[in-house]
Amino acid sequence: MMMKWIISILTMSIMPVLTYSSSIFRFHSEDIELCYGNLYFDRIYNNVVNIKYIPEHIPYRYNFINRTFSVDELDDNVFFTHGYFLKHKYGCSLNPSLIVSLSGNLKYNDIQCSVNVSCLIKNLATSTSTILTSKHKTYSLYRSMCIAIIGYDSIIWYKYINDRYNDIYDFTAICMLIASTLIVIIYVFKKIKMNS
């Protein structure tokens, strides 16, 4: 009987920490999917290029608020930035809760194009940022068109330290874990003392 109580109290004490960490991981993994997709590059004339980026997957819980796209060209190098501003579908705020910025450069000649891409995801709901980077990847140019399948070589994920709401939540979860552990230890010692 005592073992059941110990297991149930320990389970209840660990649940807030597990729930919090799994929700961060879920947000983190779904947000990263916005950085994967296909980049279409088409050189229409000598000095006119057309770039289009289509993400593979858009998480169902976000609505697009706005997007920006800028392209600069210097000789055979094209620099582009594609920004998404998304809002949580069920949130009450009108402000964006997710900002995704895909930027990179594309170098081309008559037979191939080389793409170097980085993606920054800033999740304002979880106060986390993710940076994905790729090295130069080469693709064949077919009829002045190049289709680049975007993949990444490194992923860096970090959480903001100065966010007050997440710090309060972290502190509450840790206090609950410590308090419930102390309750279990005191209960076990009292039971042992009574039995001896």
UniProtKB/Swiss-Prot annotation:
The way this protein sits in the membrane is described as:
Single-pass type I membrane protein
Please name the InterPro entries in this protein's record: Orthopox_A43R
Question: What's a GO cellular component annotated to this UniProt protein?
Answer: membrane
- State the superkingdom: Viruses
Q: Which residues form the signal peptide?
A: 1-21
What causes induction of this gene? Expressed in the late phase of the viral replicative cycle.
The entry annotates sugar attachment on: N66, N116
Q: Where are the transmembrane segments?
A: 168-188
Keyword annotations of the record? Glycoprotein, Host membrane, Membrane, Signal, Transmembrane, Transmembrane helix
UniProt name for this protein: Protein OPG172
- Provide the species name: Monkeypox virus
